[in-house]
């Protein structure tokens, strides 16, 4: 009887020890992140997504993909994420987000920097997500930008280059048209389908306009250096809705949100989803806080274009490019 009691006690002790053993380490979640093309702004979004997830204490394995501006490649990436059974997929820019949403019917799809998610068919309303889809919009105040460009640079004819086969750019074009009508400015447009055409498009309109306005067209920004070179030689000003590219010099004025912060905002949505919240319950997020935005004036470019910038604009800018150097206030 004593032997049985000792054996029973030993079993109980082992059971108790087992109950206090360290829990098994959970497997890292699998997250696919794809961008339509590589340029600094989208790289910043990607970095922000990853940092937000890391800061939330979530261990993750990433499959990072770049479609190189090709819609067919975007579809292949979506199928790759499907076969790998990722726990969540992030689409940076409209074409890749649409490809993911088309292919992944049950996997959470979080889009980042999509100008018009309703127009792109990703969601039916901005009030909440759609089934397994939600995300962050990079809509910018186009009409205000055009009015500001007119006030500061005195332009009467405005150039605009857009990607004709990208939903994001088609939506932006309508806003540019509206902004020009309201400001009483003539609009000259040139369409492209790939980054190789950006320089040729810039050359086609540079002598017909007083300046050019850039929205967040990813194909244009993937070849931004060639456009800046063309307009720089002609001493014509550039206004950009993306501040990232302007930090290298040559772009007269830029106003837009910080893309790294936009990436973090997108990553925070991913964290919500990984923690159990349904995409359909999460509204589309916008970067509306003033601290999310930057305003840059390039005084070197202004001087080259013969533009005198009023002190009130210089005072309101949080970044000044002068004498080949960027200064942050």
Residue locations for each model-derived region?
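Positively charged n-region of N-terminal signal peptides that target proteins for export
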Residues: 1-4
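Hydrophobic h-region of N-terminal signal peptides that target proteins for export
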Residues: 11-19
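Short hydrophobic alpha-helices and adjacent helix-cap/hinge residues
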Residues: 21-329
